[in-house]
């Protein structure tokens, strides 16, 4: 028997997570070129760390971000700019548009993975698909 790539449960969780992410951020803020929602507070720090890192040359260690800081160099880790995504997207910096941001994508991934793993854990404990789907909705809507 051929194994399915995606089950309907994963599709339901994906669509629900995406819908909640649109509700949470707004459709316009889910655009990768919209930085207007990243100009205040900690979000501005995340975006600035990413911009300095994106515009700098490749250095070793990979997360080194010497232009971000006043007198001493820093690392992408200390600006909370999600180093895994920062290093990944820096590889493609010549193909990205100038005002690129990946934080809305990161928020969606966090919500979806929280839903998916909560479904898998609850299903492992109960073996009940409807109960697992409904329970995982609570994990989607309680963003921690």
Label each region the model flagged.
Residues 2-4, 124-127:
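Positively charged n-region of N-terminal signal peptides that target proteins for export
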Residues 98, 127-128:
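Short, well-ordered coil loops that connect the C-terminus of an alpha-helix to the N-terminus
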Residues 1-15:
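N-terminal membrane topogenic signal
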Residues 108-124, 130-144:
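Membrane-embedded helix bundles of polyisoprenyl
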Residues 18-114, 142:
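Membrane-interface coil-to-helix junctions
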